[in-house]
Amino acid sequence: MSKKYELYEVKDGKIVRKNPECVRCSHGIFMADHGDRYACGRCGYTQWKNE
């Protein structure tokens, strides 16, 4: 079962995404946080975090 509610938080009365969305896939596909990188489970795209 999906837990998309865990990917959002409320700051100053506005909804903010915790993880980025995949640039290759459509909207609503979030990337997983793996510490030093973000990875898409759907297409495999990896985005490295900057230090």
Swiss-Prot record:
InterPro entries: Ribosomal_eS31, Ribosomal_eS31_arc, Ribosomal_zn-bd. A zinc finger (C4-type) spans 22-43. Gene3D superfamilies: 6.20.50.180. One of its GO terms (biological process) is translation. One of its GO terms (molecular function) is zinc ion binding. Disulfide bonds: none annotated. The keyword Calcium does not apply. Pfam families: Ribosomal_S27. One of its GO terms (cellular component) is ribosome. Binds 1 zinc ion per subunit. Its cofactor is Zn(2+). The keyword Metal-binding applies. Zn(2+) binds at residues 22, 25, 40, 43. Keywords: Metal-binding, Ribonucleoprotein, Ribosomal protein, Zinc, Zinc-finger. Part of the 30S ribosomal subunit. Belongs to the eukaryotic ribosomal protein eS31 family. This is Small ribosomal subunit protein eS31. It comes from Methanosphaera stadtmanae (strain ATCC 43021 / DSM 3091 / JCM 11832 / MCB-3).
